[in-house]
Design a protein with these regions (language model features):
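STAS-like cytosolic regulatory interaction modules
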Residues: 1-52, 66-102
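Histidine-anchored nucleotide/phosphate-binding helix
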Residues: 61, 65
Length: 102
């Protein structure tokens, strides 16, 4: 998986490309832990080029959401494919995550 991070004003945009699974989920976790939350209002996950997400990937996104919420930082997930949106819906994550489909 490829992860790109860009910072614009008080927004961190993390773009994921490839597969978010057991092998690659720790990469996203490490990237999220490297963010200076004192300077950030919103973290945006751009999933436009994400092909697949496993339960490990969902777990990392849930942990990121909880961590950000405890710090008063918003998590926004954008460019979600129909397939990945189905997973968010089936797990109930779509009920509390700010998600925008493609």
């Amino acid at each position: 998986m490829e992860i790109n991070k860009a910072i614009s004003n008080q927004n961190v945009i993390i773009t994921l490309k490839g597969r978010l699974d057991t092998m690659t989920a720790p990469q996203l976790d490490d990237e999220a832990k490297s963010i200076d939350f004192d300077e950030v209002e919103t973290v945006t996950l751009n999933l436009k080029d994400l092909e697949y997400i496993s339960s490990s990937g969902l777990r990392v996104i849930l942990a990121l959401y909880k961590n950000l919420k405890s710090k008063g930082v918003n998590l926004k997930i954008v460019n979600v494919s129909n397939t990945i949106m189905e997973l968010f819906s089936m797990t109930g994550m779509s009920d509390y995550l700010d998600i925008e489909q493609e």
